[in-house]
Amino acid sequence: MPAKSRQNPEVREFILRNVATHPADIGSLTIQEFGLSRTSVNRYVLRLIEEGLLEAEGNTRARRYKLRNIVSVGFSIKLSFGLFEDAIWRDRILPEMKDVPQNVVDICQYGFTEMLNNAIDHSASFDCLVTYEQDYCSIKMMIADEGIGI
């Protein structure tokens, strides 16, 4: 178990909330916002990488950071009469949503079941691909079918 962090949670949160829009200059932006040294900001970034919340791409001069997926799930399902969207939600997606606030879970459930119901009832497709991705700041769900697209 890693040692207890003495890092300022406000700095960590700032980095995580802003890295998507500032992948190449998150260090400079954090220095400007908090008045920290480059070394100190680098420690924050390295800790977030070690914790699996950020990932780095490129070498030192061209290094870019991005949020790392905490969860990434994809699966295919057969669209058939009698398929219940709430069962797919309950059995396949909901178990992946650990530590997500209940109000967010409720919104995601509504969106997911409506999208899947639409694919079942209206796409005329035989199957669909479901993906669920979650990082520190966002949740992305996609249902892709090969239907008629109206």
Task: Provide a role label for each language-model segment.
Residues 8-28, 32-33:
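Short amphipathic alpha-helical interface segments
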Residues 45-46:
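Short, hydrophobic-biased segments on the C-terminal half of alpha helices
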Residues 28, 32-33, 92-113:
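Conserved short strand/loop->alpha-helix "switch" segment adjacent to the catalytic nucleotide/phosphoryl-transfer site
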Residues 75-102:
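Helix-loop-beta hinge of the Bergerat
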Residues 55, 61-74, 120-150:
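Conserved beta-strand-loop-beta-strand hairpin that lines the nucleotide-binding pocket
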Residues 39:
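Key DNA-contact positions within bacterial/archaeal DNA-binding proteins
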Residues 103-131:
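Conserved ATP-binding N-box helix of the HATPase_c
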